[in-house]
């Protein structure tokens, strides 16, 4: 995906050295693919962890933490040209927190939409897919318009901040209406 493109255009020399020295991989595209796969793996494998955290702390508190972390890391990525190893770690953490946020969202869904859970999971999955596509396009636009990814990371941080504000606007109503009826942690 686009993470490979980002890594290739920003850290090609570092990835080439890492690929040859550590992985014995002469093809830098393969090395970039490994790093992209590692970050995607973090997002996928940690979804249940996010759900478990939301079961303990509540979905809203969990989303605040996960989205807050993503927002902060996106701001850091927009503000600084990070060294290669730190950039990989930051991307890993962004994807891990997005995956855990997914688990937290699905902790809330059955409480709010118990009778319509099938359609709601479909709608939420669709929104996630469209959001991922929009993110890719935003990074592509950023690279084309500004020859870098700063604007893409900044827009990503703004969108995540808007999500945090959206949660803040509805949390009291959620807790005093369906949250009480559901009996779960929201």
Regions found by a protein language model. Give the residues of each.
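A membrane-interface helix-boundary motif in multi-pass transporters
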Residues: 141-159
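Extracytoplasmic gate region of multi-pass secondary transporters
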Residues: 1-45
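Cytoplasmic membrane-interface "Motif A"-like loop-to-helix N-cap segments
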Residues: 55-67
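Interfacial helix-cap and linker-helix signal at transmembrane-aqueous boundaries
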Residues: 7-8, 53-54, 138-147
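C-terminal ends and interior cores of transmembrane alpha-helices
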Residues: 68-82
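Multi-pass alpha-helical transporter architecture, strongest
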Residues: 157-186
């Amino acid at each position: 995906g686009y993470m490979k493109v980002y890594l290739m255009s920003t850290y090609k020399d570092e990835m080439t050295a890492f690929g040859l020295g550590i992985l014995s991989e002469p093809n830098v595209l393969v090395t970039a693919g490994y790093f992209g796969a590692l970050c995607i793996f973090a997002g996928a494998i940690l979804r249940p962890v996010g759900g478990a955290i939301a079961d303990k702390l509540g979905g809203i508190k969990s989303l605040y933490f996960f989205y807050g972390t993503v927002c902060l890391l996106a701001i850091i990525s927009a503000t600084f040209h990070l060294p290669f190893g730190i950039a990989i770690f930051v991307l890993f953490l962004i994807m891990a927190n997005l995956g855990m946020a997914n688990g937290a969202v699905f902790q809330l869904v059955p409480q709010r939409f118990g009778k319509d859970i099938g359609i709601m999971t479909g709608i939420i999955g669709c929104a996630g897919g469209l959001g991922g596509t929009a993110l890719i396009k935003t990074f592509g636009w950023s690279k084309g318009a500004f020859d870098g990814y700063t604007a893409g990371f900044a827009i990503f941080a703004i969108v995540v901040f808007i999500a945090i504000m959206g949660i803040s606007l509805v949390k009291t109503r959620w807790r005093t209406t369906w949250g009480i009826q559901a009996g779960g942690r929201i």
